[in-house]
Every structure is written in structure tokens, then in C-alpha cells.
Amino acid sequence: MGCCGCSGGCGSGCGGRGSGCGGCGSGCGGCGSGCGGCGSGCGGCGGCGSGCAGCGGCGSGCCVPVCCCKPMCCCVPACSCSSCGKGGCGSCGGSKRGCVSCGVSKGACGSCGGSKGGCGSCGGSKGGCGSCGGSKGGCGSCGGSKGGCGSYGCSQSSCCKPCCCSSGCGSSCCQSSCCKPYCCQSSCCKPYCCQSSCCKPCSCFSGCGSSCCQSSCYKPCCCQSSCCVPVCCQCKI
């Protein structure tokens, strides 16, 4: 029986494909390219799970665009960035997690500029760090926190480099459009203040704004002891 499930070649019993099936020989390890399925480089249609639809749902595996069962992509056990193709995992810095998070479709890692070394160089631009995830080797330059800078914030000086800079502030200072939560960094801006969108509501006395942070309690964001008690205010993550 051939890999199209046809006995004696590809007749009308081959899902209606007829002779255009290209013979569907078992030597291709799956469906022959003439079947409209996997080519011989794919390693067989058995590698094309329905969970791979859209080339971005492979879980711990990696979607490789060059070996697809149309309209789905094949998942491979580990992320081999060299096989992910231009604009895909290859521009994520080469880590397994980086590739998995970015997927292989245009607009993922490509939106970071596709520069070597990961998405950290995107500087927090739209569709940047948040899209790539945030583990060492992928978006590690974004701080390495789970979810990436875009999702979990950049309140530490090591979190977002390069980062947006507001006028009069040091190069490592995050601007509101750069990182979330919108926090100034202790190395470049004073006071150590978080904007209202940085902290969750606190149990503060009336008259204290949520943008008020205490320098000694910068991580997580806290209300200043001079205006509120209790002092704690968790950062939004």
C-alpha cells in the first residue's frame, strides 16, 4: 500500500487525487509532494499534527516551514534554528524557547528587526519583546523574566536594553511607550516613581496617588511611607 493509502498506486481510491498524486511511493516516508501533502524532506506526514495549524502552535516543538503538510506545518522535537528559515526562528538568537515563542510566520521575530542575538535589540517596539517571550538566549537581553518585557515590565535597569529614553533622562531610562509597567529606572531617573498604570490599587489613605513610589521599596512598586500606610503596592504583572 502506498503512502496515500492506495493499493497499486494512486487510483481513484486515493482520496480523489487520481494520477496527479505522483505515485505516492512509500519511499517518500509519507505523502509524496504530488499528493498536496508532505514532500520527502518532511520525514512523513506523521510529523504534521493538527496542533501545528498556522505554524505557531507546536508547543515544545518547532514548526519548520520548509516541511509542511499543507496547510499545516510539521513539528520537530527541538528547535533547530538553522532549519527554520529566513524570518523565522533563525532571527531569534538560536535558543529553543526563542524559536518556539516566535513561531515561523512573518511578523513575529521579524518585527524585532531580525537582528542577531535575539529580540532585545528591538527596544520595546510594538510586536517586539512581548512576541518573543523572555528566556535566556531568546529575549534574554530583555531581562529574562517570564513572558518578556512587553508582558511583565521593565522596572530594572537590566530589563530593557536598548530602551526608549525620555528627554533629560539617562540612556537606560524607560519611557512610558517602551516598557510596561511604566517605571523609571533608579540609575537614571528620580524620584523612583511608577506611573498610575504600573501599580495595582493599594490600601492607602485618601490623598495618596497610585503613582507614588518609595525608593527603598522599588521592587515591587510601593506607596511612599511619607504619604501612605501601609506601604506595599504590587507591580502589575
Curated annotation (Swiss-Prot):
Coiled coil: none annotated. Signal peptide: none annotated. Interacts with hair keratins. The keyword Translocase does not apply. Restricted to hair root, not detected in any other tissues. In the hair cortex, hair keratin intermediate filaments are embedded in an interfilamentous matrix, consisting of hair keratin-associated protein (KRTAP), which are essential for the formation of a rigid and resistant hair shaft through their extensive disulfide bond cross-linking with abundant cysteine residues of hair keratins. The matrix proteins include the high-sulfur and high-glycine-tyrosine keratins. Sequence repeats lie at residues 62-65, 68-71, 74-77, 159-162, 178-181, 188-191, 198-201, 227-230. Residues 62-230 are annotated as: 8 X 4 AA repeats of C-C-X-P. Keywords: Keratin, Repeat. This is Keratin-associated protein 5-5. One of its GO terms (cellular component) is intermediate filament. Belongs to the KRTAP type 5 family.
